[in-house]
A protein has these predicted regions:
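Acidic/glycine-enriched connector segments
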Residues: 1-152
Length: 153
C-alpha cells in the first residue's frame, strides 16, 4: 500500500445526501493531494456511493484506479462493475468471518495515507475504526476527511 492511497469508511445506511460532498472530496484528493489509488468495500450504502463517485471521477481522471477490498475470499457476492482490481489483505485467511470486515478495514486504515469517511453514529464498528484512524492522524500518519454532518448523515 502507498501513502497516496485513499480508503473509505462509512455506515452501511448512509444515504445519497452525502453524494455531492463525497464527489468534491474525491476531486480534491485527486487534484490537490495527488491520490491515484482508491479502495472501497462493497457491503454497504457508503461503499456503493464511494465507488460510484470514484467511477465518475475516473471519466475526468483516467489515471485513477478503483480497487475493491475483499474481507472474505472468495468474495461471497458479485462485485459492482467498474472496479480495476480486488485486494485481499495479508493475514486474513484465519480471521473468523464475523470479524473479517472490521479487520480488513483496520488493515486498510493502517496502510493508507488518506481516509474519506462518513461516520456519525457512536457505539458502532465504524466509529471504533474512526477512533483508530484519528489516533493515526494525530501522529501524522493519516489525513482524514469526515463528511458526517453533510446532508442528513
Amino acid at each position: 500500500m502507498q501513502e497516496r492511497a485513499c480508503f473509505f469508511i462509512g455506515h452501511r445506511d448512509t444515504g445519497p445526501e452525502v453524494a455531492a460532498g463525497l464527489a468534491d472530496a474525491i476531486e480534491r484528493h485527486i487534484t490537490e493531494y495527488g491520490v491515484r489509488d482508491f479502495y472501497t468495500g462493497h457491503y454497504g450504502g457508503f461503499d456503493r456511493l464511494a465507488a460510484q463517485a470514484v467511477l465518475r471521477a475516473k471519466k475526468r481522471h483516467p489515471e485513477v484506479a478503483l480497487t475493491c477490498l475483499l474481507p472474505y475470499y472468495p468474495a461471497g457476492r458479485p462485485l459492482m462493475p467498474g472496479f480495476d482490481a480486488t485486494f485481499y489483505p495479508p493475514g486474513m485467511e484465519d480471521v473468523p468471518k464475523r470479524f473479517a470486515i472490521p479487520r480488513a478495514n483496520r488493515w486498510m486504515i493502517a496502510h493508507s495515507g488518506y481516509l474519506i469517511a462518513c461516520v456519525w453514529r457512536p457505539a458502532s464498528n465504524t466509529q471504533g475504526l474512526m477512533e483508530y484512524a484519528l489516533s493515526r492522524e494525530r501522529r501524522g500518519l493519516l489525513h482524514i476527511t469526515n463528511l458526517a454532518g453533510q446532508g442528513d448523515g
